[in-house]
């Protein structure tokens, strides 16, 4: 279990690095008016975005290895610490210093994750999930994504959501998709000791590749649609929650479910959610997206907001 925790923290650090690099690389890419499959092609021309992809791959490797040593319900909540690492990157290299409420939110989120894991005590589970269970989980995830696209971009001539709401809806769908991918990674990790032939012959590898490509496009649109404050809570909160639920549903992992245990788990989980929401709205995390109450933007940020230059972002798997 100790190895799984260390590897999950390393995965979280890598995905945070990927997020920061991809935001930097996407700064000069204009937002899409609707769903644009070519957005990834434009982003691939940015060196910083490619560096973010490399960090993202590193995060995938660490996550895959962590799931080899620990349960899905243990590993995924730790990955929610990604927002803390983003906070740290921006505190060191960003133009603004953290305020006391930023540090309080970070402490609440970090402590909440640790206490939740301690009380939930995830354990057990099987290596493989049944085919019908996978089919149901995949259909539900696909339905959520399609519904999010319809709400975000409109359907049958109806106008889509506003930019902020679009970012929030797509961010939520992306977080759920990442949680589903984590479950697929868990299935794939059970074949790591069987040799390369077993890995390339299993269906979970190809499902992971397809889901990963689709989720990358979805994440790019979520972060391109509007402020990071709108999309980041969906990434940070729904990813581990979805993965934990799938760990129980698909793999039979066990968490403490007694009345007293559930009541105790609810409090730190609420702290995690509140901390993630507060950090995602802070001036440090928003960065180039100015909001009332933040200090004046530095010259570099004002230049990024000059006419014809709209900052957007794209993120991890």
Task: Enumerate the predicted regions with their spans.
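Polytopic alpha-helical membrane proteins, predominantly small-molecule transporters/carriers
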Residues: 1-317
């Amino acid at each position: 279990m100790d190895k799984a925790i260390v590897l999950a923290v390393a995965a979280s650090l890598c995905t945070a690095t990927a997020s920061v690099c991809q935001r930097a690389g996407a700064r000069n890419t204009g937002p899409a008016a609707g769903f644009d499959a070519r957005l990834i092609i434009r982003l691939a021309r940015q060196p910083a975005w490619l560096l973010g992809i490399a960090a993202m791959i590193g995060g995938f490797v660490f996550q895959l290895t962590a799931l080899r040593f620990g349960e899905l319900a243990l590993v995924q909540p730790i990955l929610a610490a990604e927002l803390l690492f983003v906070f740290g990157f921006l505190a060191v290299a960003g133009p603004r210093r953290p305020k006391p409420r930023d540090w309080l939110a970070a402490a609440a989120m970090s402590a909440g994750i640790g206490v939740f894991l301690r009380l939930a005590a995830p354990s057990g589970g099987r290596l493989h999930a049944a085919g019908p269970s996978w089919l149901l989980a995949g259909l539900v995830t696909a339905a959520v994504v399609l519904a999010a696209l319809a709400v975000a971009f409109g359907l049958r001539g109806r106008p889509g959501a506003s930019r902020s709401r679009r970012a929030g809806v797509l961010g939520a769908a992306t977080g759920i998709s990442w949680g589903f991918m984590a479950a697929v990674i868990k299935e794939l990790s059970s074949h790591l000791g069987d040799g390369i032939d077993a890995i390339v012959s299993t269906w979970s590898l190809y499902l992971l590749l397809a889901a990963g490509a689709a989720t990358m496009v979805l994440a790019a649109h979520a972060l391109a649609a509007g402020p990071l404050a709108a999309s980041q809570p969906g990434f940070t909160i729904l990813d581990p929650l979805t993965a934990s639920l799938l760990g129980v549903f698909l793999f039979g992992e066990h968490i403490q479910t007694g009345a007293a245990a559930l009541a105790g788990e609810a409090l730190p989980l609420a702290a995690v959610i509140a901390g993630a929401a507060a950090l995602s709205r802070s001036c440090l995390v928003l960065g180039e997206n100015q909001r009332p109450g933040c200090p004046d933007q530095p010259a570099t940020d004002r230049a990024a907001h000059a006419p014809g230059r709209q900052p957007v972002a794209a993120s991890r798997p």
